[in-house]
Swiss-Prot record:
GO terms for biological process: regulation of DNA-templated transcription. NCBIfam families: PRK00110.1, PRK12378.1, YebC/PmpR family DNA-binding transcriptional regulator. One of its GO terms (cellular component) is cytosol. It is found in: Cytoplasm. HAMAP family: Transcrip_reg_TACO1. Its main location: cytoplasm. Gene3D superfamilies: 1.10.10.200, 3.30.70.980. Pfam families: TACO1_YebC_N, Transcrip_reg. Belongs to the TACO1 family. This is Probable transcriptional regulatory protein COPRO5265_0905. The keyword Transcription applies.
Length: 248
């Protein structure tokens, strides 16, 4: 899962910069609205909303903004109507790319995404063309200092639907089945382990190694996609070279 780690690490640094200038609040607001609309305003019974609230808090989004977004999603306040879409395509080197969007204008967003793919030498594909190369997983990150033994943690969580527990630099990443994410989060909370990040993501089944030149083109494409306000998440099966991670 090293490719996921590299792109995530780059994106995490970028997200901090986005948060500092308030850009990320637009994306967080849309996710809160959609989550509350689809599953109701109670995070105790709505995992997606629970995760969205945690992300908003981590980005220092004001509580009033969070509450208003949830109220809009629940229908208690008027607001823009958003729809979700998943775009699939290929980037430089033939790597697979998934783009999750939340938009108030699908035609505009589709044109924007297509333009970005084309500008970077990629192509959009039909629905299902590349999504089969990914699996939907719950992803939980912990500070490594909270985990004395990876083996013990793995044994402790195996009955909760955990697929894997990996040690990565100064963090520990737990991968779960989507419907197990909430149970694992509850258990970690009960035993006093603080979660740094928890999300539902598309994880590649296999990664594709790319050259440094291809990696730079792919990274430029991913970053431009991520900069679009309508784009919520971008996933790829590209195993980006270490040198690119060090430069960011």
């Amino acid at each position: 899962m090293s490719g996921h780690s590299k792109w995530h690490n780059i994106k995490a640094k970028k997200s901090k910069m986005d948060a500092q200038r308030g850009k990320i609040f637009t994306k967080l607001t849309r996710e809160l609205v959609i989550a509350a609309r689809e599953g109701g305003p109670n995070p105790d019974t709505n995992l997606r909303l629970r995760v969205a609230i945690d992300k908003a808090r981590a980005a220092n989004m004001p509580k009033d903004n969070i509450d208003k977004a949830i109220a809009k999603g629940a229908g208690n306040l008027e607001g823009q109507e958003f729809v979700e879409a998943l775009y699939e395509g290929y980037g430089p080197g033939g790597v697979a790319i998934l783009v999750e969007v939340t938009t108030d204008n699908k035609n505009r967003t589709a044109a924007d995404v297509r333009r970005i793919f084309s500008r970077h030498g990629g192509t959009l594909a039909e629905s299902g063309a590349v999504s089969w190369q990914f699996e939907r997983k719950g992803v939980i990150e912990l500070n490594k200092e909270q985990v004395p033994s990876i083996d013990e943690l793995t044994l402790e969580l195996i009955d909760f639907g955990v697929d894997d527990v990996l040690e990565e630099d100064d963090s520990v990443t737990i991968y779960t089945q989507p419907d197990a994410l909430s149970k694992v989060l509850d258990h970690l909370n009960e035993v006093g382990i603080e979660v740094s990040r928890a999300e539902l993501e598309f994880i590649p089944k296999n990664y594709i190694s790319v050259s440094e030149e291809e990696g730079r083109k792919i990274l430029s494409m991913l970053e431009e996609l991520d900069d679009n306000d309508d784009v919520q998440e971008v996933y790829t099966n590209a195993d980006l070279p270490e040198v690119l991670t060090a430069e960011e």
